[in-house]
Amino acid sequence: MSSIRERNKELILRAASEEFAEKGFAAAKTSDIAERAGLPKPNVYYYFKSKENLYREVLESIVEPLLEASAPFNQPGHPAEVLRAYIRTKIRISREHACASKVFASEIMHGAPHLSAERTEQLNAQAAHNIACIQSWIDQGLMAKVDPNHLLFSIWAATQTYADFDWQISAVTGKAKLDDADYEAAAETIIRLVIKGCEVQEPV
């Protein structure tokens, strides 16, 4: 019974991510979510109680990976290695959580009305920590004197664009869906821009 419950919740959550990403919170309908999930509409309310709760769960499904992406900043490490790992993880999140990433981006653009105060505080605290780490590397002469805030913003923009603007990327590349080689090229390109552009010293 538990496995059926988890499977149904996962189906609904995935369908909701797609619906909210395509239509936004206001326009998305639970009936469409249920149809996309291949389940009766009452199941949506049975497992999630309301459309708003379901929307919050979609946000939660992307917030946790975003926080975990900063793990390299939370332990001792060389800046080049930390930045490489961070960028690769951010690219992977954009690939594996594309719809939820779009929902999160839309939520942020609208002032994050559905994001809990606790999650907002956690995200802000982690960003502040990452910025402090970058500033520390600058102070130690391990990289160029760039603005750490804008470096972090640039990494966010460069990596998240592969989820948030996938339609544009598909139009330019002529591919309906990027493959492993494309994502590897994306990660390597961003890494090179950051490491070389910010003159980050490589570990000896």
Where do the protein language model's features map onto the residues?
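Hydrophobic alpha-helical connector segments
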Residues: 71-100, 145-155, 184, 204
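Amphipathic alpha-helical linker/stalk segments
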Residues: 58-85, 121, 127-136
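Amphipathic alpha-helical segments used for helix-helix packing
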Residues: 95-117, 165-173
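N-terminal intrinsically disordered/low-complexity leader segments
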Residues: 1-7, 14, 202-204
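Helix-turn-helix
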Residues: 11, 19-53, 57
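Hydrophobic/aromatic residues within well-ordered alpha-helical segments
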Residues: 8, 51, 58, 62, ...
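Short hydrophobic clusters on alpha-helical segments that form packing/core surfaces
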Residues: 12-20, 90, 194
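C-terminal peripheral helix-coil segments that are non-catalytic and often amphipathic
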Residues: 92, 96, 124, 128-140, ...
